[in-house]
């Protein structure tokens, strides 16, 4: 009980930090009237979009809430509600701050680069700490209510089902927010670039482009609210899955309650280390923005090792806590698994930066390919996107095997928990991106002096890299988290099958085998494997349609208002924002339901065909593995490849020197080819790739809930 209260106190501390940082950001200077006017357009557009998005999700949520109440229990329905509301709140509040921090960052950048960095990072840290704090509070407070308040045993089905439902609530918000926000932001970006840069020859963030405000709105709803919902879900779902595994592996043991609070204690310790880490993000004498951000991340990671040790010592201790599948599990081994999780995080960050960072081989190779035309740019971009999957996959495989050797599947779960303990700092780095991007746009549209734009460009270039790095982290943690969920599914299934007297549906299941000689297992693997590709294809098509609509709208305005190009007429910014809002909401519904319904279709489809519950459960389990494996590769390929395309385009803004020593500037044929590549890469890295993340996890969560419903 004492540990749990300490966990809740740490969750509250992160919320207090967010409130303090919000007051600090909002107290900063907003700049001149023109800057405030442009920021107002962005703020209104972002709030209008999110309000409409959450209204749509609420309608779906009400249906799911009623279904959970009828099929499971009132506690499960309330758990779903808690997960959904807190996930939405983290993204909404974070975006509420970011659309106010953008103009303040632009103004601060006119004073100094250090001031601009301070405001932008602090606004990102608000979102980060809200994600970590609200997710931890949601799980720990509800767990406390279910056990100490309602008197349920920690491993009781009422508790487990309610916590899994909480994860499902977060998942549902996440997939809608990620996909809807991605369609909006990339529809605006692609459409605006094709007409603005390629046809009209005007630079990015030029106020004459009617899609400019929509593009800046999209940065916030996609990279701030969308990423917040994504990592909130991964955080909550992975902690819940670890607790579910603890309830199965240590059922009946005296240490059960303590082991179930261990992942919560790890996350609580990491919140403290993340808050400390934020104070180390200061521009040094070398004026390296990335260096300042990495200093905060490294301090957080190093302190988290100490925090992990403290959490281990205060909860389970260093000795043996029990035997699982013939393996002696010790506190020391679990501590080592947590460190492996932190090492995996560091390696994924380094690898992703290598594949997406400017002046690195992959990005330079795409820029060089642009010199010979549009086609070679696309070919090289695709090559980099495929190559970028290898090293992260090897790191994840190494992490799985190492942790399994130390403490079995529970060790892998603890590694994922430690990875996600850093979510507060990681989300801060991500939410820093849209703020700096917007600040650059506001500086450009307000005609601030060139030296201000130079500062905002420097911040924005780093923001692009941090966004790519955090996507890599989100995918890696999602892949490992989904593996933990699969372990929870297979162990839950074994528990129900062994206790058929208490759960009549499972009384006649028989032996469930995931053997590859079973044709239903192979069929399940293939069916699961197609979901990320189909989901990604639908998402890319949606961006294409939204982008085409923006192209037509921008062309129409240029044609009907020729004074726009001369600066005599003002574009109708609101038209593009409203059009994209409707398109994104319309396009996100069907693909979002695909991973939700897939597990149900697999189970009942195979049951209908084979007449065997064992075959149906085996096919369902195999489909989950298919989603995890293919989803991991699709997501990494799309996000890293798209990030490389983006920074290859940016290489031409200051002039790219090819292998023959020729300098290619903005507006050159090579630059135009790089814009084409970036147009392909944008929906890759900001829509389809990131949206595969929640799709991987939600299929596993639905499978867990299906077991609970059938039981």
UniProtKB/Swiss-Prot annotation:
Source organism superkingdom: Bacteria
Keyword Mitochondrion included in the entry's annotation: no
Segments traversing the membrane: 1-21, 48-70, 83-103, 126-146, 164-184, 239-259, 261-281, 296-316, 331-351, 382-402, 409-429, 468-488, 520-540, 589-609, 616-636
GO CC annotation, single: plasma membrane
Record's bilayer topology term: Multi-pass membrane protein
UniProt-listed Pfam families: H_PPase
GO MF, any single term: magnesium ion binding
Enzyme class of the recorded protein, top EC level: translocase
Cofactor: Mg(2+)
NCBIfam families: PRK00733.1-2, PRK00733.3-5, V_PPase
Similarity annotation: Belongs to the H(+)-translocating pyrophosphatase (TC 3.A.10) family. K(+)-insensitive subfamily.
Classification via HAMAP family: PPase_energized_pump (MF_01129)
Protein name in the entry: K(+)-insensitive pyrophosphate-energized proton pump
Organism placement in taxonomy: Bacteria, Pseudomonadati, Pseudomonadota, Alphaproteobacteria, Hyphomicrobiales
Gene transcribed to yield this protein: hppA
């Amino acid at each position: 009980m004492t540990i749990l209260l300490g966990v809740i106190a740490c969750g509250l501390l992160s919320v207090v930090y967010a409130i303090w940082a919000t007051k600090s950001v909002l107290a900063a200077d907003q700049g001149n009237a023109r800057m405030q006017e442009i920021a107002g357009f962005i703020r209104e557009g972002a709030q209008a979009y999110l309000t409409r998005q959450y209204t749509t999700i609420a309608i779906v949520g009400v249906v799911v809430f009623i279904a959970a109440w009828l099929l499971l229990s009132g506690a499960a329905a309330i758990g779903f509600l808690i997960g959904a509301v807190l996930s939405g709140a983290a993204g909404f509040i974070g975006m509420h701050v970011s659309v106010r921090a953008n103009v303040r960052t632009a103004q601060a950048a006119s004073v100094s680069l250090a001031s601009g960095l301070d405001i932008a990072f602090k606004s990102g840290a608000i979102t980060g700490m809200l994600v970590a704090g609200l997710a931890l509070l949601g799980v720990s407070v509800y767990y406390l209510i279910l056990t100490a308040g309602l008197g349920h045993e920690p491993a009781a089905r009422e508790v487990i089902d309610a916590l899994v439902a909480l994860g499902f609530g977060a998942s549902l918000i996440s997939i809608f927010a990620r996909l809807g926000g991605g369609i909006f932001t990339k529809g605006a970006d692609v459409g605006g670039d094709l007409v603005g840069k390629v046809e009209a020859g005007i630079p990015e963030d030029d106020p004459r482009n009617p899609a400019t405000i929509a593009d800046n709105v999209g940065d916030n709803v996609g990279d701030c609210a969308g990423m917040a919902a994504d990592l909130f879900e991964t955080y909550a779902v992975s902690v819940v899955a670890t607790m579910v595994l603890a309830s199965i592996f240590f059922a009946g043991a005296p240490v059960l309650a303590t082991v179930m609070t261990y992942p919560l204690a790890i996350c609580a310790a990491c919140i403290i280390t993340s808050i400390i880490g934020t104070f180390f993000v200061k521009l040094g004498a070398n004026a390296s923005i990335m260096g300042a951000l990495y200093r905060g991340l490294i301090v957080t990671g190093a302190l988290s090792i100490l925090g992990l040790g403290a959490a281990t010592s205060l909860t389970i201790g260093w000795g043996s806590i029990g035997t699982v599948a013939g393996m002696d599990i010790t506190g020391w081994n679990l501590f080592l698994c947590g460190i492996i999780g932190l090492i995996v995080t560091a390696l994924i960050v380094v690898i992703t930066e290598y594949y997406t960072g400017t002046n690195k081989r992959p990005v330079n190779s795409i820029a060089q390919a642009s010199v010979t035309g549009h086609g070679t740019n696309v070919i090289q971009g695709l090559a980099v996107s495929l190559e970028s999957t290898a090293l992260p996959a090897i790191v994840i495989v190494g992490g799985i095997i190492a942790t399994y050797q130390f403490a079995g599947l529970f060790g892998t779960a603890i590694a994922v928990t430690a990875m996600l303990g850093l979510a507060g700092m990681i989300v801060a780095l991500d939410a820093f991106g849209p703020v700096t991007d917007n600040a650059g746009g506001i500086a450009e549209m307000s005609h601030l002096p060139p030296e201000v734009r130079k500062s905002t460009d420097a911040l924005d270039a780093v923001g692009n890299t941090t966004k790519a790095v955090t996507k890599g982290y989100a995918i890696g943690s999602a892949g490992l988290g989904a593996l933990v969920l699969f372990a929870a599914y297979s162990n839950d299934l074994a528990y129900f099958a062994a206790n058929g007297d208490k759960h009549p549906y499972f009384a006649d299941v028989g032996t469930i085998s995931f053997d590859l000689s079973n044709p239903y297992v192979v069929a399940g693997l293939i069916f699961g494997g197609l979901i990320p590709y189909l989901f990604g294809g639908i998402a890319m098509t949606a961006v294409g349609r939204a982008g085409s609509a923006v192209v037509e709208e921008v062309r129409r305005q240029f044609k009907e208002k020729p004074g726009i190009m001369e600066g005599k007429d003002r574009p109708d910014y609101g038209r593009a924002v409203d059009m994209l809002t409707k398109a994104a909401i319309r396009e996100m519904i069907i693909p979002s339901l695909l991973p939700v319904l897939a597990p149900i279709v697999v189970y009942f489809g195979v049951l209908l065909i084979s007449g065997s519950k064992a075959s149906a459960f085996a096919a369902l389990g195999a489909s989950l593995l298919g989603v995890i494996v293919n989803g991991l590769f699709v997501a990494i390929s799309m996000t890293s490849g798209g990030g490389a395309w983006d920074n290859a385009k940016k290489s031409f803004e200051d002039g790219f020197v090819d292998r023959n020593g020729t300098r290619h500037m903005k507006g050159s044929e090579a630059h135009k080819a790089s814009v084409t590549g970036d147009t392909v890469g944008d929906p890759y890295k900001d829509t389809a790739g990131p949206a595969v993340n929640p799709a991987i996890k939600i299929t596993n969560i639905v499978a867990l809930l299906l077991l609970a419903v059938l039981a």
